[in-house]
Curated annotation (Swiss-Prot):
The chain crosses the membrane at residues 13-33, 40-60, 89-109, 110-130, 137-157, 165-185, 194-214, 230-252, 265-285. This is Protoheme IX farnesyltransferase. Carbon 2 of the heme B porphyrin ring is defined according to the Fischer nomenclature. CDD domains: PT_UbiA_Cox10. It comes from Saccharolobus islandicus (strain L.S.2.15 / Lassen #1). The keyword Zinc-finger does not apply. Pathway: Porphyrin-containing compound metabolism; heme O biosynthesis; heme O from protoheme: step 1/1. Belongs to the UbiA prenyltransferase family. Protoheme IX farnesyltransferase subfamily.
Length: 285
């Protein structure tokens, strides 16, 4: 296997799509903390470090889950499953990236490095190893891994975590269950076959659709409170986006199918991305 092919395999294992959203959360956290006269340079080591650590965590996750990934159609083509990267190699390379990413966080401050490391620890040890194979609460508690990215971004400029910074991380925590349950509903049979107790594999489609709607509804007050802290423009934009999210959640309850679930999943991605982009834009204008 050539070096180019090996790098391509690791980039696939690193889940750049997921990591890019975590990066956006981190940058949004930094801009949320931004005040006139504060240097934006600390964003650079935080961004690079967070990216490397997040990719490292994803690679370790793929190394740990090879056996179950083999029986899931969604993951059966991963480089770890087809043999391009073995378990030991994935864990070693992922660990090195996570350590390097955390080390870069120290360029800013100890708190930023702590939150970068915290995201890795929660994703690997709490979510992947402890909770995912054992309880439907796996993604609920595991959502704090995404929160850590936002907190790393916020603390990179402030070396402290205030209420508004906490709210951004808590927003991501609240967003995570409904988002991933929508995906799990689409691939319910995969999780059943792999013996993962993801909520849709445990309670069925109809109850899962209701749980997704409830989870999204519980998130919205946090979104609106954050919008209130930012400014009126953000609050109005967040309200409009949240109304459409709940419309899709309502449609999923009325028609709990895989097709509606994937629509909910796709828009929840767009929803969070737009929330984070709006936060950045209103700080720039």
């Amino acid at each position: 296997m050539s070096l180019q092919q090996k790098i391509k395999a690791y980039l696939k294992l690193g889940k750049l799509g997921v990591v890019s959203l975590l990066d956006l959360a981190a940058v949004a956290g930094a801009f949320l903390a931004y005040k006139h006269g504060i240097s934006l340079l600390p964003i650079i080591p935080m961004f690079i470090g967070g990216t490397l650590a997040s990719m490292g965590a994803m690679i370790i996750n793929s190394g740990i889950e090879i056996d179950r990934d083999k029986v899931m159609s969604r993951t059966s083509k991963r480089p770890t499953v087809v043999g391009y990267v073995n378990r030991k190699e994935a864990i070693i390379v992922g660990s090195l990236l996570a350590i390097l990413g955390t080390a870069l966080g120290f360029i800013d401050n100890i708190l930023t490095a702590f939150f970068i490391a915290l995201g890795v620890v929660i994703y690997i040890f709490v979510y992947t190893i402890l909770l995912k194979p054992r309880t439907w609460l796996n993604i609920v508690i595991g959502g704090f891994a995404g929160s850590a990215a936002a907190w790393a971004g916020y603390t990179s400029l402030t070396n402290s975590l205030t209420l508004e910074g906490f709210l951004l991380g808590f927003l991501i925590f609240m967003w995570t269950p409904g988002h991933f349950w929508s995906l799990a509903l689409k691939y319910r049979e995969d999780y059943v076959n792999a013996h993962y107790p993801m909520l849709p594999a445990v309670v069925g489609i109809t109850t899962s659709a209701r749980a997704i709607a409830i989870s999204n509804a519980l998130m919205i007050p946090i979104v609106l409170l954050l919008g209130y802290y930012i400014n009126l423009i953000a609050l109005i934009a967040f309200s409009i986006l949240s109304l459409f999210l709940m419309f899709l959640s309502y449609r999923l309850i009325l028609n709990p199918t895989k097709e509606e679930a994937i629509k909910s999943f796709i828009f929840s991605n767009i929803y969070l991305m737009l929330i984070l982009l709006i936060m950045i834009i209103v700080k720039l204008i």
